[in-house]
Amino acid sequence: MDVTRLLLATLLVFLCFFTAYSHLPPEEKLRDDRSLRSNSSVNLLDFPSVSIMALNKNSKEISRKEAEKKRSSKKEASMKKVARPRTPLSAPCVATRDSCKPPAPACCDPCASCQCRFFRSACSCRVLSLNC
């Protein structure tokens, strides 16, 4: 009984190690110097070095001003787009996507038709064909 438990514990440890090792990305796997030298396709000197520079107060202020200018220009552009007032629909018709229960008049759009659902409890004007 103790031998089987020891064997199962060893198998469990091996599986845990194998699972953890197989999920490491290729660049995080352990390598020795010989494998780095022999692998000519990956040369660490080919990659450019990364330099980190701290921003001074002046550059921070400039970037803030640029961000504020972008925000204000977006607000101005949105304010310039004024919604056109809709033309009032004539009384004897129903607008698209509005309720059109049977006592109501026909739909205003010639391509739309009145569709009812749920035993004619919810009816609305809908456009069926895009080519119309």
From Swiss-Prot:
Its biological purpose: Involved in the regulation of melanogenesis. The binding of ASP to MC1R precludes alpha-MSH initiated signaling and thus blocks production of cAMP, leading to a down-regulation of eumelanogenesis (brown/black pigment) and thus increasing synthesis of pheomelanin (yellow/red pigment).
Species assigned in the record: Macaca mulatta
Subcellular location: Secreted
Compositionally biased spans, kind Basic and acidic residues: 61-79
Any GO MF annotation of the entry: melanocortin receptor binding
Biological process, per Gene Ontology: adult feeding behavior; epigenetic programming in the zygotic pronuclei; generation of precursor metabolites and energy; hormone-mediated signaling pathway; melanin biosynthetic process; melanosome organization; melanosome transport; positive regulation of melanin biosynthetic process
Name of the coding gene: ASIP
Domain comment in the entry: The presence of a 'disulfide through disulfide knot' structurally defines this protein as a knottin.
Signal peptide (residue range): 1-22
Keyword terms: Disulfide bond, Glycoprotein, Knottin, Secreted, Signal
Protein name: Agouti-signaling protein
Matching SMART domains: Agouti
Coiled coil: none
Cellular component, GO annotation: extracellular space
Pfam families for this protein: Agouti (PF05039)
Classification via Gene3D superfamilies: Agouti domain
Keyword Phosphoprotein: no
Residues of the Agouti domain: 93-132
